[in-house]
């Protein structure tokens, strides 16, 4: 009986979340935005942010693109826009501006996935994948992973 009640409660929660997401999507579409429009705009926001922040080393990009309550899943950086800005200030010390080398970008609703080719200080390459969640034109959540590109590979497929 208890298992049945827990199952029904789980179903009810999923239904409520789905309904809320669907209503939010319907509200955007009523404003004349299609899902394609939203995906394109979210990709543009992430591309602009990434170049300004990581390419141009412009810390004020945080103020323009990152929500104050920013959720950070990278264990080396604390939550919040201010904490992210402080961490980036340390990363950028002595670093030159650069053109961001985007290999792939995709979006699915409020999520944007970006795959980049980066150079390490020694000139070797690094593959970076970032995932951003956006709300109302601001980045509210972030996940990332990085991998050095090995000199040799077990297969003939490039990382980029």
Q: PLM ranges: what are they?
A:
Residues 21-52, 56-64, 156-160:
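Short, low-complexity N-terminal intrinsically disordered segments enriched in polar/charged residues
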Residues 98-100, 124-129:
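Short, surface-exposed coil-to-beta transition loops
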Residues 10-19:
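Bacterial N-terminal signal peptides
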Residues 62, 107-111, 132-140:
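Short, solvent-exposed coil/turn segments at beta-strand boundaries
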Residues 59-64, 68-107:
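A solvent-exposed, acidic/Ser-Thr-rich amphipathic alpha-helical stretch
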Residues 1-8:
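Bacterial N-terminal signal peptides that target proteins for export
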């Amino acid at each position: 009986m208890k298992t049945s009640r827990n199952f029904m409660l789980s179903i009810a929660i999923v239904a409520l979340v789905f309904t809320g997401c669907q209503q939010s999507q319907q509200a955007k579409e009523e404003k004349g935005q299609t899902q394609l429009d939203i995906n394109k705009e979210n990709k543009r926001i992430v591309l602009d942010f990434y170049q300004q922040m990581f390419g141009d080393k412009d810390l004020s990009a945080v103020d323009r693109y990152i929500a104050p309550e920013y959720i950070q899943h990278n264990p080396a950086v604390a939550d919040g826009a201010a904490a992210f800005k402080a961490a980036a200030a340390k990363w950028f010390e002595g670093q030159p501006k650069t053109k961001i080398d985007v290999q792939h970008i995709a979006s699915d609703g409020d999520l944007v996935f970006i795959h980049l080719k980066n150079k390490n200080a020694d000139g070797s390459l690094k593959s970076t994948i970032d995932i951003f969640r956006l709300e109302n034109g601001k980045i509210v959540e972030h996940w990332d992973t990085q991998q050095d590109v090995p000199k040799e590979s077990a297969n003939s497929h490039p990382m980029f």
